[in-house]
Amino acid sequence: MPHIQPPILSQVPVIAAVCEPAIALTKERQSLKIEGSVTSKNFAMTGVAGYIAPRHLKAIVDTGSRLVAAMDPHDAVGILDRYSFDVRFFTEFERFDRHLEKLRRGPSGDRIDFLTVCSPNYLHDAHIRLALRIGADAICEKPLVINPWNLDALVELERETGRRVHTVLQLRLHPSLVALKQRLGASEHRHTVSLTYVTSRGRWYDVSWKGSADRSGGIATNIGIHFFDLLLWLFGPVTDSEVHLSDSGRMAGHLELERATVRWFLSTDRGDLPFAPQPGGKTTYRSITIDGEEVEFTEGFTDLHTQVYERVLAGEGFGIADARPSIELAYQIRHAKVTAPRISPHPLLA
């Protein structure tokens, strides 16, 4: 293991004084003007009945666009009426596909410009391919794919169709985290990081697609992918990785990144919460510490999806190359053998 110098926080004010640049960045994004925004873009969506879909529905409307068609095998989609009474809705993928193809062959003003993918993880790349095939860009929730080699086919399809695949890496736009990255970038010191994320789930979770590693990618992908992307974005690529715990509901390990040593712990087990959860109450605990100091970013999430859409429409969205490192890391973690820790493990394993 390489020698790790003790962190010197006084030389790197990582956590403190982030407000001023964060506010400036927020104002900059809020003032971002989308060229050509006078022309409303046509959107379609898969997975419109799902948990994350409302954030995308709001982002579509907030950016002056309109949803013209949506699909989900579940028909509890009354939320559509908050935004439009005219959305064509389908419960069968084949009929949805046929409708989008009909629009593609019709007047140019009716064609789909963007297909938003909010479906289960294992369907993401298939629905992205639909977008590219009908001449639309795709905006896809994390992860773009479960297995990293499927990214290569999407890169080829981008080249063949001239369309783009965009992913949603909204934490990279969070003002406090943007300011934190700027401050970290000014230092050559290595940092000691602890990541703890416990989001308790009931018995339904194991029955749903989310509880199936083949369909969700397991918890490293399903609940960990956005944190792994954040860590790689802040501290650079992986140089070493260990997995100390791996089962269907809990994973933990150690990462050596270019500029940090990371101990991480992910869980859907309510027994790992530092408090006693109650149905309908708080059921999630999230903590990231850098050199022993907590990173505070519990606020500021309300319009991050809208900011993602603004940047996509301005030609500045996150693409396949941005998503690849965290997808590869989550895949490696999912398939890694459990080993004894070579350094002190995460505190919840100690």
PLM features: residue spans?
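N-terminal Rossmann-like dinucleotide-binding module
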Residues: 19, 25-86
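C-terminal helix-rich "cap/oligomerization" subdomain common to oxidoreductases
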Residues: 19, 25-37, 102-107, 114-116, ...
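Beta-loop-alpha module in the N-terminal Rossmann-like domain of NAD(P)-dependent dehydrogenases
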Residues: 56, 89-139, 143-155
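A contiguous active-site-proximal alpha/beta segment in oxidoreductase catalytic domains
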Residues: 122, 145-203
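Rossmann-like dinucleotide-binding domain that binds NAD(P)(H)
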Residues: 203-272, 324-328
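C-terminal substrate-binding/catalytic lobe of Rossmann-fold NAD(P)-dependent oxidoreductases
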Residues: 248-304
